[in-house]
Amino acid sequence: MKIPLLLQNKKKLLKIMGLFFLLMIISFFLLRNTVLNWAIDKVATKFKNKYHGEFSVQHAVFSGISAIALQDICLTSPAKDTLLNIEQLDANIKILPLLLAHIRLDEVFIDSTNIAIFKTAKKDNISFLLKSNKQEKKDSIDKRKGNIDIGNLAYNFVKTIFDVIPQKVQVLSTSIELQRDTAYFKTTIDTVSFIDGHFHCNINTVESKGKSLYILNGDVNKDERTLNFSLYPHQIKEQTSFPILKSFLNLSISFDTLFVALNHTDYDSDILQLEGKALIKKGALNHWRISPKDIALDYAEVNYKFNVGVAELSLDSSTSIKLNKMLIKPYIHYQHSPKKTLAFDFKIPKMDAQEFFVSLPTGLFQNLEGIQAKGELGFNMHFFMDTEVPDSVEFVCAMPKNKFKITSYGEARLSKLNEEFLYTAFERGHPIRSFLVGPSNPNYNALANISPYLQNALMTSEDGNFYWHNGFNENAFRKSIAENYKKGRFARGGSTISMQLVKNVFLTRNKTIARKVEEALIVWLIESNRIASKERMYEVYLNIIEWGPGIYGAGEASAYYFNKKAADLTLAESIYLAMIVPRPKWFKYNFDETGKLKPHVADFYRIIANHLVRKEIITEEQKLALLPDITLAGPAKELILIKDTLGVDSLNLPELDLMLESD
């Protein structure tokens, strides 16, 4: 008898639930306009309390079973300046998801949208949104720190984006206006259409830097969670700059075609995988931090795969990049917990050497343009750091080659190191003096005519392994990375004498990313192909480095400080000259008002002397007899007696032992 009773109770329960559900639906239809306006008022009140601005909808009503019509939607700042205005927004809401408290739109129609954002000295209608929520965001981040599942968070974000995309969208007459100080941008979009997974729009832009018209086409598959789009200028020959970037970031990007695709989305075993493709044709880029000239690239293609885990992000090793004919295989892995680690691998498999150089973007490495080579050339770099043990950092860099040979040097004329040439010294980016590096210059000194004490003291201080490395001191570079990370700032460099020489002789003084990479490439070309001997490189270096105000080379320095020839420098004088190379214009701060070296200098003398003893350059007796005591006899003597108006007591150099490279 119990079973029929249970069935009867179950039927009653189902009837009650059905009735309750029906009442909810009826109540919703009867009260839907009231509920809609109540919800809008609640949003408006919350916005006003939080940001002191105003959110309003002039007219809001349900029309039909599931259609909402909103008119005159407005968002204003506390100063009553309008950020957003939409004259009309009609949307069809899917009923079933709505009953489950999920808003899913079926169709959307928007007409006459105006967005105006200003941040100038006289007008600012956006800062109130950015400032009000700072502490709340910080508290939220602090609360969740260490407990965020990055993979799940990213997956839910991607899933939500695809879920909320309506089946059909039509947007008419959109205007977006942005201004920050003197930078100005305005775009108008007549029509945006999205029907059956395909979207299209024309984008007209007006900037302080010019006008442009772009066409955007693409497809979205909500079920598969894939998408792709193409963006290209209306008239390809115009090579117009991509909107906004030029005005606000001083970054100019132009192209014939930009294509981006997300081809696969998968979430399995707590890892989100995103795979896709991006390519650009006839691209050009310009930014003063990258290169002083336009960087041009005929073709670039990326086939990417991102992995996002619970506490890690990675660019998968299956990712490939193609620059013209060059294939690049990158790998990046960042782990947030239980400890922070960063791994980076960058590989260019060996390829035809001429195609290697031709594939480099023009304008990026100006000195390498026109270079001719044969054989094969590649590139490998590996980096790994465990932030808990920064001293264990791994860094390996190499350019494997096969029968590689330079047949023509192109723009750089790297072989000029073996000849007499005109050198121009720069200060703060401006040329201040030019002189010949060679026998025609009376201040020039061959290596044999420069004191061995100076040669070895300077090499010990600047690059102790100069004669044994191939232009790059990986051990010094690893120490530099670790030291800079531990101190949280740039505290130690890793440049070798070869790198300093190339920077001074071949490159501009523009501090750009391209210059640093070009510096490394030229160093490798010179060192690995023996374009100039180590002895010749060091000889040129000793004759061009700055050693004081307007003083260049060992010949001028020995006369300026000691009124003697470079060959006659003593051990104490040589160590002093080696010490001031990092900051030659500060030399006078090493002396007190009596003309004697200050006590702190003794540490540098001791460290250099110990290294020279180990290298058997000097004897133990010479070290014991060495005193940090020199007598200025040249024009420099007149400067040290001038009272120090800056109030500097000592030379603010990095820790002395960090200036020295290990043997």
Where are these regions (language model features)?
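N-terminal Lys/Arg-rich, disordered targeting/topogenic segments
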Residues: M1-K11
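N-terminal amphipathic/hydrophobic interface segments
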Residues: K10-K11, K15-T76
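Generic structural motif
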Residues: G53-V57, A91, A373
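Flexible beta-edge/linker motif
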Residues: H59-E177, I195-S230, T265-D266, I271-L272, ...
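Juxtamembrane regions of bacterial inner-membrane/periplasmic proteins
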Residues: K42, L105, L153-P166, F185-H200, ...
